[in-house]
Amino acid sequence: MQPRWAQGATMWLGVLLTLLLCSSLEGQENSFTINSVDMKSLPDWTVQNGKNLTLQCFADVSTTSHVKPQHQMLFYKDDVLFYNISSMKSTESYFIPEVRIYDSGTYKCTVIVNNKEKTTAEYQVLVEGVPSPRVTLDKKEAIQGGIVRVNCSVPEEKAPIHFTIEKLELNEKMVKLKREKNSRDQNFVILEFPVEEQDRVLSFRCQARIISGIHMQTSESTKSELVTVTESFSTPKFHISPTGMIMEGAQLHIKCTIQVTHLAQEFPEIIIQKDKAIVAHNRHGNKAVYSVMAMVEHSGNYTCKVESSRISKVSSIVVNITELFSKPELESSFTHLDQGERLNLSCSIPGAPPANFTIQKEDTIVSQTQDFTKIASKSDSGTYICTAGIDKVVKKSNTVQIVVCEMLSQPRISYDAQFEVIKGQTIEVRCESISGTLPISYQLLKTSKVLENSTKNSNDPAVFKDNPTEDVEYQCVADNCHSHAKMLSEVLRVKVIAPVDEVQISILSSKVVESGEDIVLQCAVNEGSGPITYKFYREKEGKPFYQMTSNATQAFWTKQKASKEQEGEYYCTAFNRANHASSVPRSKILTVRVILAPWKKGLIAVVIIGVIIALLIIAAKCYFLRKAKAKQMPVEMSRPAVPLLNSNNEKMSDPNMEANSHYGHNDDVRNHAMKPINDNKEPLNSDVQYTEVQVSSAESHKDLGKKDTETVYSEVRKAVPDAVESRYSRTEGSLDGT
């Protein structure tokens, strides 16, 4: 059995669950709406740097429940959530202590209630002013040529920050050096500034600039502490020995000294210059010395420079040297001599003081007196100089360049004759003189005209290039410094081979040739060097029917007493050794026709006409003979002759009927007809002649009843010999013979 307190606890637990369930059911039935949301900034949307800023978000929510709903408020800066809170209050705040430039931006607030949300408009927070930067230095004392490191920072702000640091001289407004740097990751920069020679007391000024949105915020300038500058070394000083007037021959000492401070880490370099030439220098001490025997050329301006990595100090002095004697002068009567002429050299000093003279050619002494004379040869060309000495002072004269010119030998001219020269081909003509002083000027003459010039400073031949198109003559002209006239070479004759060009074929007579006449074909070339090989071809024949080689520019082929066989198309080719075998020039096609001669045509016509006339005569003769024969054979046809006809198996037709009988044709039975005796014989191949005859019949025919006169036609046929002539007759008058 459970205790009583346990039973009571169980009861209250059930009541609590019931209330929670009812509350949950009631919440599901309530309705919510967000009327409006708003946002404010205290004290304002624009605030001074370092002040406090409070952002407030307001939410006006309506509900059917008597209990305010719980909602979320979200704070955004530049669309980035930075604060989120759940609350049943209508207002929530976000506090920003000591606002800075980086707090500037676009802010908004979003309220969410049961999956419903509403966002305020965007508000711009602008923080004005940049805190003054802090400036610190790595040292308060510096030496010339050293470095000062300046640290400029804005601890309150965030990067990026743009810093400007200026180097100032105390009590001077002008900025000696200005440097700028943009720090993207840190709110400070460290810059190095050199300490220069003119610097004494320095200070540094720093300024910071920060970009906020589209606005640039600039801080006030902050000055650093003062930096005292000390010299690392002093200005150099000159010491000249001997003092006073310095005469040539004395020993000259020029010394430059400095003082170096204890702060310097190393010695600077000391340099002594005469004009721009360095005459002495030292890197490991506080002085540099230049020692030399004094000569007048040592007079001039001397400069001493003391240089470290960043500092340079300079001082100058002028040194004058008194001349002991003037510079000697070397003279020559001629500087250009022909080989074999006399060379004269003379050395002198203005004022003619006694001195020791020496004349030298390059490094060789040729005379130890003032004068030098000899017959010039090629080896005497060179540079001569004279030296004059008094005590320890030795001076050199000016130099004299002597050129002894050797006469040129006759130039040789040649060309590469290994191959024949073809028209248009480039050839190299060489000109060379074996002996003679350089330089040598060469000229190449082509048919007595200057083609090209060349100057050679060596013994190599001059090479000229040309492209001859015909036989040509070359000559070489050589010249140098010698007074002799120009030298001419022998004449070089170059034979140029011209390739065959433009082959033409022609016939000397008309293209129409009468048979029996000669055909003469000409193959000619426009240009070409001999010997030239000519070949004559007939079209469609691979081999030439005639060929010849000649030095002439034309060749002929003759066919005597041409016939019809020579009719056709012809062409020719021509080439010489300058033509390539693959491209032999060829002529065009020439067509030749062969016709009969007029007298032959006349003879044939006469023969044909004679034959025709003979045939006509024979035909006429036969005709007249037959006609005469026919007239000489009258025949009288009478009745007693009828049996004869009947004996020949011929029948007579009705005398009252007219009948025409044709050879080889049988008329109607009613007609009178006569047939040959032998029907098996061939028909007569004679002409038919009709003869009118008078016939008297011996007896009357029993069937003839008429008694009138009729004309009897007799058909006479010419038969083979011994053939029977048939007669057809009709009688006139009475049939009884009266």
From Swiss-Prot:
Positions of region (Disordered): 658-715
Chain location of the short sequence motif ITIM motif 2 per the record: 711-716
GO biological process: angiogenesis; bicellular tight junction assembly; cell recognition; cell surface receptor signaling pathway; cell-cell adhesion; cell-cell adhesion via plasma-membrane adhesion molecules; cellular response to mechanical stimulus; detection of mechanical stimulus
Basic and acidic residues composition bias: residue spans: 699-715
Recorded consequence of changing L74E: Reduced homophilic cell adhesion
Transmembrane segments: 602-620
Disulphide bonds in the chain: C57-C109, C152-C206, C256-C304, C347-C386, C431-C476, C523-C572
Membrane topology: Single-pass type I membrane protein
Top-level taxon of origin: Eukaryota
Keywords from the named record: Cell adhesion, Cell junction, Cell membrane, Disulfide bond, Glycoprotein, Immunoglobulin domain, Lipoprotein, Membrane, Palmitate, Phagocytosis, Phosphoprotein, Repeat, Signal, Transmembrane, Transmembrane helix
Consequence the record notes for mutating Y690F: No effect on Tyr-713 phosphorylation. Inhibits targeted recycling of PECAM1 from the lateral border recycling compartment (LBRC) around transmigrating monocytes. Decreases phosphorylation. No effect on interaction with PTPN11
Endpoints of the signal sequence: 1-27
Name the record gives this protein: Platelet endothelial cell adhesion molecule
